[in-house]
Amino acid sequence: MAESHGEAKGGEAKGTASAHTEAEGGHGFPPFQKETFPSQIASLVIAFVALYVIVSRVALPKVGAVIDARQKSIDGDLAEAQRLKDESEAAMKAYETELATARARAQAIGAETRDKLAASSEAERKALEDSLAAKLAAAETSIASTRATAMSNVRGIAADAASAIVQQLTGKAPAAKTVEAAVDASLKGTA
């Protein structure tokens, strides 16, 4: 058994040595061998040409179509946004115009109402002044008439009172003409 184990060790040693010699011997890693460079470059060129053809014929048109579709969508959205902006500006201008018209109309109605009320109140004031002036004139006439009536009654009452006073003081009744003359003189002095 010991021999077989030793042979195995010896065999492994020979196999390892031969593997190292093959790697060092001339069979190296193919990409680093100068003899295979032309075929590697040709394979690389063929691979890149194939990749270019596939990308340019298949992938790029799809990507380009997606980009074009997105650009058209963006342009459409921008156009729609501009249209909506223009519509909103037009609506805002129409609103401002209507608002200005409504304000002007309201101011005109207010001015017209103020003028009507001023004219109406002026007419009412004038009618009231005329009515009051007529009532005042009637009152003054009534007062003058009442005063004249009262004064004529006062003259008679004053004459009777003066005659009674003189009769009480002197015991004799004075002459009616004398008493009336004295009362008239007294009333003219106070009037």
Swiss-Prot record:
Write out the similarity annotation: Belongs to the ATPase B chain family.
The alphabetized UniProt keywords are: ATP synthesis, Cell inner membrane, Cell membrane, CF(0), Hydrogen ion transport, Ion transport, Membrane, Transmembrane, Transmembrane helix, Transport
Q: Which gene encodes it?
A: atpF2
Residue runs in coiled coils:
none
Disulfide bond positions:
none
Q: Does the keyword Membrane apply?
A: yes
Subunit structure of this chain's protein = F-type ATPases have 2 components, F(1) - the catalytic core - and F(0) - the membrane proton channel. F(1) has five subunits: alpha(3), beta(3), gamma(1), delta(1), epsilon(1). F(0) has three main subunits: a(1), b(2) and c(10-14). The alpha and beta chains form an alternating ring which encloses part of the gamma chain. F(1) is attached to F(0) by a central stalk formed by the gamma and epsilon chains, while a peripheral stalk is formed by the delta and b chains.
Task: Please provide, in alphabetical order, the Gene Ontology terms of the cellular component aspect for this entry.
Answer: plasma membrane; proton-transporting ATP synthase complex
Its main subcellular localisation, reduced to a broad class, is: membrane
Q: Name one Pfam family in it.
A: ATP-synt_B
Statement: the UniProt record of this protein carries the keyword Cytoplasm: no
Q: Where do the TM regions start and end?
A: 38-60
Biased amino acid composition, Basic and acidic residues: 1-12
Localized where?
A: Cell inner membrane
- Protein's name according to its UniProt entry: ATP synthase subunit b 2
Instruction: List, in alphabetical order, the Gene Ontology terms for molecular function in this entry.
Output: proton-transporting ATP synthase activity, rotational mechanism; proton-transporting ATPase activity, rotational mechanism
Described function: F(1)F(0) ATP synthase produces ATP from ADP in the presence of a proton or sodium gradient. F-type ATPases consist of two structural domains, F(1) containing the extramembraneous catalytic core and F(0) containing the membrane proton channel, linked together by a central stalk and a peripheral stalk. During catalysis, ATP synthesis in the catalytic domain of F(1) is coupled via a rotary mechanism of the central stalk subunits to proton translocation.
Mind telling me which PANTHER family this protein's record contains? ATP SYNTHASE SUBUNIT B, ATP SYNTHASE SUBUNIT B', CHLOROPLASTIC
